[in-house]
Every structure is written in structure tokens, then in C-alpha cells.
């Protein structure tokens, strides 16, 4: 089954690579319209997935990721329309010139070909990835989590109908609907057909892909994100950032999981933090230095376990650790961070500059929430993933990250001397 999907995707990629920007936008507009027109079918399928997932004990954080509402589905359709408005990187001449031989050489941006994406209970990913791949002339094979099988099937059917109505092959966007995990291992060896693989899931999935894949893999999406509260931070303003970073949507990978507090501000900061977190319903996981003081406040507090510094909670839980200084904070982030998103709250611009220079994450913030690490917020449109590695892409992966380049030499029957 997968080989036939690979063949279909590869053939479709040749067709997609020849489309003009106008033709690709026409397809995307059709997809957005059909997502809204067929919303009842998609929402009914999603309701069944959510009911099954709840019956099987899926966590509230994962249920939030899985669930679609009419407003969320409309937002997904609007995101597709936003992709239409983005500049098409395909065909862009990156650089070039005329060589001494007279050969005119240019480096031109082109599609990668076929993208494989493995992800969990995130139905919006199906549309986000498909729209970005189509905009860049790539075919895509999707393997969503078993929890979203009905939603993904309904969504991909809508996308394929839109493709066919525009005269394009359905093989441009395909989904593996069989939940058999053995198919993941088979997919990882499809280097004959898939040019790049993007796993969006937990550490176990990333490890599996790194160990078994014969396809180049872009890993990311695991966000053990930190905020360091420097001794010069403005407490009231810092709390606004922390509330946003923790509570706006706790189930996302750019949500803060560990708060590092400079010891010189702890006495005044921790009581205010406890009050704010109590109002926000956040459970604090405190180290020994912070525990007693936080227990005197209104927030729910437990003693942090050492392994929780490496946890991506994806819930209303927040580690709190007292650190001696900036060096101590940076050392903690280097030990426990996932190179996703980390922030410093400070009025000391020398400390801010050190933090920016020394924290090796894909996104580093000064006096801002980690929640900004997002393709839409960065002006990239929807994102395929947030890469936490350094090759071939880093940070939110928008359109340009789904392209490569080719060298083109144009001569007049030119030969090398």
C-alpha cells in the first residue's frame, strides 16, 4: 500500500513543480472554500474521534489538541487563505552571476519533492502541512495519530476533491489511514519516494525516526521552554508575560514549562507569582529553595521531581527553580532545554545580550512570551513544524523551509578550459 502511495506522490510532485503561483493559489482557495462547505462532515468525524479518545482516557491536554469547533475549522480555512497571500519562494533566484568563462550561473529555489509528515492528535496539522506543501509545489504523505483517523480521512477527502476539481492528481496529498504502527517503520524506509521526513510528536517518535529512517529527518516540536526572571525584572510586567506563556494555550509546544527565578528577586517575586498562578489555576512544582515561600501563598504547590525539569507538561503545571545568577540560569537551560524557545525578563540589557548570545535555542526572547514561536506570528503563515535542529531548517518552518535549490548554468555552447 505505501509503495503505491509513494509512486503516486512522486508522480504528483512532478506536476506540482510546474505550476505557477496563480495556479497553486487557485487550488488553495478551492481547498479553503471546501473546508467550510464540508465543515459538517469534518466536525462530525472529529466528534467521533474526540468521543473515542475521551473513552480511552486521553488527557485533557491531548483532547484540546484533538478537538475541532466551527470556529477552529473556520480559522484553519482562513489560514489556508493566508498562505495564498504569502510570497511564493519557488523560482526565486537566490544569487548568481557570469563566470570568467562566460557561463551565466544562478542558484534557483525549487520544491523538495515529496514530504512525509508523522504527527499526533492535531487535525489542524493536516491542513497546515498540505497547504504549505502545495504552495511550494511539493506532494505530501501524512501519517496522523490514530486518535484523529476519522478527522484526517474526512479532511484529506475534501482536499483531494478540491485537487481533482482543479485538474490535479489526488496523489498530491495522501494520508495513511491504517493505525498499524508497523507502517511508520515502513514509511521511514521510503527514501525512493520521500525526500524529507518531519516527525511531530514526542521524544519516542523522534528517537525512532533518527534510528530507523533512511530519509533526511527534521526533528522538532518538543518544547521544554524556559523563562528566566532576572533580578532587575519589573514584577508586574513579568507576571503578564508568564501568564501568557503558561496559560494562553497550555497544550502547545511553545508554552513555558520551567520558570527560573534569580535569588535576589525571589522574596518579592514569589508571593506575587503565587497569587497570579492561583488565579490562573496553575500548579507550581517548586524546588527546595522556593517551596516554603510558595506554600505560604494561595497557589497549589508540590515539590518538584528532578525528572520534571525534562518534562513537557502541556498542561497547567509550571516548574519553579531559584537560580543564583544568569550563569546558573543558562547552565540549567543548556542541561534541560530542547533548543525550542527560551526567554529572559530583565531591564539589564547586558544580561539580555548575554542570554541571547549564550542560549542556543531556535528562538530566544527578551521581555516577551515564548508563545510567539509560531509560523503565523513570525509572518511565515502556517507552519509545518518548529525545528529544534540546525540543518536544514531552524525554528518555525514556513514556505522557504520546504524548498531546496538547484544550480543552473546557461552558456553559448560554452566549454570548460
UniProtKB/Swiss-Prot annotation:
Signal peptide: none annotated. GO terms for biological process: L-proline biosynthetic process. This is Gamma-glutamyl phosphate reductase. Catalyzes the NADPH-dependent reduction of L-glutamate 5-phosphate into L-glutamate 5-semialdehyde and phosphate. The product spontaneously undergoes cyclization to form 1-pyrroline-5-carboxylate. Pathway: Amino-acid biosynthesis; L-proline biosynthesis; L-glutamate 5-semialdehyde from L-glutamate: step 2/2. It is an enzyme of class 1 (oxidoreductase). The gene is proA. Its main location: cytoplasm. GO terms for cellular component: cytoplasm. GO terms for molecular function: glutamate-5-semialdehyde dehydrogenase activity; NADP binding. InterPro entries: Ald_DH/histidinol_DH, Ald_DH_C, Ald_DH_N, Aldehyde_DH_dom, G-glutamylP_reductase_CS, Glu-5-SA_DH, GPR_dom. Keywords: Amino-acid biosynthesis, Cytoplasm, NADP, Oxidoreductase, Proline biosynthesis. It is found in: Cytoplasm. Belongs to the gamma-glutamyl phosphate reductase family. HAMAP family: ProA (MF_00412). CDD domains: ALDH_F18-19_ProA-GPR (cd07079). The keyword Amino-acid biosynthesis applies. Pfam families: Aldedh. The keyword Amino-acid biosynthesis applies. It catalyses: L-glutamate 5-semialdehyde + phosphate + NADP(+) = L-glutamyl 5-phosphate + NADPH + H(+). Its EC number is 1.2.1.41.
Amino acid at each position: 500500500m505505501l509503495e503505491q502511495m509513494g509512486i503516486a506522490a512522486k508522480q504528483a510532485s512532478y506536476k506540482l513543480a510546474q505550476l505557477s503561483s496563480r495556479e497553486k493559489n487557485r487550488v488553495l482557495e478551492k481547498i479553503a472554500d471546501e473546508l467550510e462547505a464540508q465543515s459538517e462532515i469534518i466536525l462530525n468525524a472529529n466528534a467521533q474521534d474526540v468521543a473515542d479518545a475521551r473513552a480511552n482516557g486521553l488527557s485533557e491536554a491531548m483532547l484540546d489538541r484533538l478537538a475541532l469547533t466551527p470556529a477552529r475549522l473556520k480559522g484553519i480555512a482562513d489560514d489556508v487563505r493566508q498562505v495564498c497571500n504569502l510570497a511564493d519562494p519557488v523560482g526565486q533566484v537566490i544569487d548568481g552571476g557570469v563566470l570568467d568563462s562566460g557561463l551565466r550561473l544562478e542558484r534557483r529555489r525549487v520544491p523538495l519533492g515529496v514530504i512525509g509528515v508523522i504527527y499526533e492528535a492535531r487535525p489542524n496539522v493536516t491542513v497546515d502541512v498540505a497547504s504549505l506543501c502545495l504552495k511550494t509545489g511539493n506532494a505530501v504523505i501524512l501519517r496522523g495519530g490514530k486518535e484523529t483517523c476519522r478527522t484526517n480521512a474526512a479532511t484529506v477527502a475534501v482536499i483531494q476533491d478540491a485537487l481533482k476539481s482543479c485538474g490535479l492528481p489526488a496523489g498530491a496529498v495522501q494520508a495513511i489511514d491504517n493505525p498499524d504502527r508497523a507502517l511508520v517503520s515502513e514509511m521511514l524506509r521510503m527514501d525512493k519516494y520521500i525526500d524529507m521526513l518531519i516527525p511531530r510528536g514526542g521524544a519516542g517518535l523522534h528517537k525512532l525516526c533518527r534510528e530507523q529512517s533512511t530519509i533526511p529527518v527534521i526533528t522538532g516540536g518538543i518544547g521544554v521552554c524556559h523563562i528566566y526572571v532576572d533580578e532587575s525584572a519589573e514584577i508586574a510586567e513579568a507576571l503578564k508575560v508568564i501568564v501568557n506563556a503558561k496559560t494562553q494555550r497550555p497544550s502547545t509546544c511553545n508554552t513555558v514549562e520551567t520558570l527560573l527565578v534569580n535569588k535576589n528577586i525571589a522574596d518579592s517575586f514569589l508571593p506575587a507569582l503565587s497569587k497570579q498562578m492561583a488565579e490562573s489555576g496553575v500548579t507550581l512544582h517548586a524546588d527546595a529553595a522556593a517551596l516554603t515561600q510558595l506554600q505560604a501563598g494561595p497557589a497549589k504547590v508540590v515539590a518538584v521531581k528532578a525528572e520534571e525539569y525534562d518534562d513537557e507538561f502541556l498542561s497547567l503545571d509550571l516548574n519553579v527553580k531559584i537560580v543564583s545568577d544568569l550563569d546558573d540560569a543558562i547552565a540549567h537551560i543548556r542541561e534541560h532545554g530542547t533548543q525550542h524557545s527560551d526567554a529572559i525578563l530583565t531591564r539589564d540589557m547586558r544580561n539580555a545580550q548575554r542570554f541571547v548570545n549564550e542560549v542556543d535555542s531556535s528562538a530566544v526572547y527578551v521581555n516577551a512570551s515564548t508563545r510567539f514561536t509560531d509560523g503565523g506570528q513570525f509572518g511565515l503563515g502556517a507552519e509545518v513544524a518548529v525545528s529544534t535542529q540546525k540543518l536544514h531548517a531552524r525554528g518555525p518552518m514556513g514556505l522557504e523551509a520546504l524548498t531546496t535549490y538547484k544550480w543552473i548554468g546557461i552558456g553559448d555552447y560554452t566549454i570548460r578550459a
